[in-house]
From Swiss-Prot:
Organism annotation: Bos taurus
Protein purpose: Regulates exocytosis in mast cells. Increases both the extent of secretion and the sensitivity of mast cells to stimulation with calcium.
GO BP annotations, alphabetical order: exocytosis; proteolysis
Keyword annotations of the record: Acetylation, Cytoplasm, Exocytosis
UniProt-recorded name of the protein: Secernin-1
Domain of life the protein comes from: Eukaryota
Family (UniProt): Belongs to the peptidase C69 family. Secernin subfamily.
Record keyword Cytoplasm present: yes
GO molecular function, one term: dipeptidase activity
Main location: cytoplasm
Taxonomy of the source species: Eukaryota, Metazoa, Chordata, Craniata, Vertebrata
Note from the entry: 'Secern' is an archaic English term meaning 'secrete'.
Alphabetical list of Pfam families matching this protein: Peptidase_C69
Gene3D superfamilies the record matches: Penicillin V Acylase, Chain A (3.60.60.10)
Length: 414
């Protein structure tokens, strides 16, 4: 498999973001044929001493988990990106570091995204959850559904809530984190933290010294110390994409950035593709709801961003969920990945038809794209009304919001 291109996570805080909103966005660059699903899990209570089965290992469950909505490769337990009922959003980046990632099966970075969302009611709580689990269980295992080779990586995370964000970068069990409360931040598939470190593993610096990577004389620069060769000197091409925006950053701005192929933010190569995208808007005014827009389909430039709002009675969306193969899933059997089952869900299949039209028939494709963007615009305008309204949100009106959007999209493609 070719070397994976970068995927990007962004966050913008006021005053760069509009109207007291925190805006979060993520593109997931993964193997072209991999299917992502969008799944909602309600809050739940769990029996004492119960276990939770993650992608490769089981760990102790906590007494209560928060409601979450996630976008994930359909073969694994965790998530590439997602949000919880408390307005916490997390996205994961696969990182190469000076210390090779373990191939031994442990927690994946994607597992840690989901665990952070399920167990953290703030961005800082989610960070604390992730680093505690790293210390206890470590990270490792194949990031791809590939029987021929193990693709293992270290992990970086962008963890965001209504008030602050944390960039968390990890190498094995060691980690450093930076707190963000203003401006624009982007992370991709490189270590990015330098000398501004607001929290760290207690043995981070002594470990670097023991490996001969830092002598203790110069100022400690995390990415210089832990990056392979001169990797830390190169700059992600998408890093300036948001910063150069002259207008206040909105949901539409973030969507446009995620659709930008010229900058490399939207990946479309022979082996890799942006297989799913998300944009979240988190009002700093706690009385307004957080809104999360998922594609559930590949290539955001040819997808519709569909809104989701947490309420007590969220209607499940099986049409955006992949088939379940249970214990017969080749991802759960050892040796793993001996077969590749058809994981396409109904929305994905409908979108395949749309992609074929967009690629093969210029006139029909232009009409189709125009209609897709009009559907998306209607959703964005309806959500803008919710955010600017002084009336309290009626949960009965939005419990089936994402369901209706997916259903409308599928019917339109048919």
């Amino acid at each position: 498999m070719a070397v994976a291109p970068p995927s990007y996570c962004f966050v913008a805080f006021p005053p760069r973001a509009k109207d007291g909103l925190v805006v979060f966005g993520k593109n997931s660059a993964r193997p072209r044929d991999e299917v992502q699903e969008v799944v909602y899990f309600s809050a739940a209570d769990h029996e004492p001493e119960s276990k939770v089965e993650c992608t490769y290992i089981s760990i102790n469950q906590v007494p209560r988990t928060h409601a979450i909505v996630i976008s994930r490769p359909a073969w694994l337990w965790g998530a590439e990106m997602g949000a919880n009922e408390h307005g916490v959003c997390i996205a994961n980046e696969a990182i190469n570091a000076r210390e090779p990632a373990a191939e031994t099966e442990a927690l994946l970075g994607m597992d840690l995204v989901r665990l952070g969302l399920e167990r953290g009611a703030t961005a800082k709580e989610a960070l604390d959850v992730i680093v505690a689990l790293l210390e206890e269980h470590g990270q490792g295992g194949n990031y791809y559904e590939d029987a021929n080779s193990c693709h293992s990586f270290q992990s970086a995370f962008l963890i965001v809530d209504r008030e602050e964000a944390w960039v968390l970068e990890t190498v094995g069990k060691y980690w450093a984190a930076e707190k963000i409360t203003e401006g624009v931040k982007c992370i991709c598939n490189q270590l990015s933290l330098t000398t501004k470190i607001d929290a760290e593993h207690p043995e981070l610096r002594s470990y670097a010294q023991s490996q001969g990577w830092w002598m203790g004389e110069d100022e400690f620069n995390f990415s210089e110390v832990f990056s392979p060769a001169d990797d830390h000197l190169t700059c992600c091409s998408g890093r300036d994409t948001l910063e150069k925006q002259e207008e206040s950053i909105t949901v539409q701005t973030m969507i446009d950035v995620l659709r930008d192929k010229a900058s490399g933010v939207c990946v479309d190569s022979e082996s890799f593709l942006t297989t799913a995208s998300v944009v979240s808007v988190l009002p700093q005014n706690g009385s307004s709801p957080c809104i999360h827009y998922f594609t559930g389909t590949p290539d955001p430039s040819r997808s519709i961003f569909k809104p989701f709002i947490f309420v007590d009675d969220v209607k499940l969306v099986p049409k955006a969920q992949s088939p379940c193969f249970g214990d017969d899933d080749p991802a759960k059997k050892e040796p793993r990945f001996q077969e590749k089952p058809d994981r396409r869900h109904e929305l994905y299949k409908a979108h395949e038809w749309a992609r074929a039209v967009l690629e093969s028939d210029e006139e029909q494709g232009q009409k189709l794209r125009k209609t897709m963007l009009e559907l998306e615009k209607q959703g964005l305008e309806a959500m803008e009304e919710i955010l600017t309204s002084s009336d309290p949100l009626d949960p009965t009106e939005v419990g089936d919001l994402f369901y209706d959007c997916v259903d409308t999209e599928i019917k339109f493609f048919k």
